[in-house]
Amino acid sequence: MREMQERAYEKRGEQYLLIKSPPASGKSRALMFLSLDKTTNQDIQQAIIIVPEKTIGKSFDNTKLSDYGFWADWQVNPKWNLCNSPGEEGGKIKSVKAFLESEDKNLVCTHATFRFAVENYGTEVFDNRLIAVDEFHHVSANPDNILGNHLREFIERGKVHIVAMTGSYFRGDADAVLSPDD
């Protein structure tokens, strides 16, 4: 593990984590380590990794972490990488629901797919799961930011683990990523 990944892994028991590190510094791999620990050792049922666009989903392809001394490998069933798959369950939103009802551990989808899944199925269906938000600076405290509103609901409910990853705290506009209460 890189130094940043080790620091993140040391905090793996926390319910909420923010990983702020420059691009190409290993945030995706750090999340793999965290996710595997949470779903294997912390009784977290599943991990849902959400990315802003489909091309970024490639960062979460299967990875042989054991080649580098880790105790497990990162695996995503191809039908649950909705950045590469059209969704085999009647569309991507229905595929999220099917994943939640499955025994599989990892799903990768876009921010948009996740937002629509939360709108369709509510926050309760995500209880006891890890929600990892890549490119977290896309979230905003602005009430018009749907992803930000959903994350606020998850935090208020307190029944999911959240890992937020970003290379920058700044959005390029005047909106705060989180409100002081969050």
Regions found by a protein language model. Give the residues of each.
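Interdomain helical connector at the RecA1-RecA2 junction of SF1/SF2 helicase-like NTPases
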Residues: 161, 173-182
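Walker A/P-loop
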Residues: 14-34
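Pre-Walker A (Motif I) flank of P-loop NTPase domains
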Residues: 13-19, 45-46, 104-105
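Switch/connector loops and helix/strand junctions flanking conserved nucleotide-binding motifs
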Residues: 57-62, 116-117, 141, 171-176
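SF2 helicase catalytic motif II
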Residues: 112-113, 122-164, 168-169
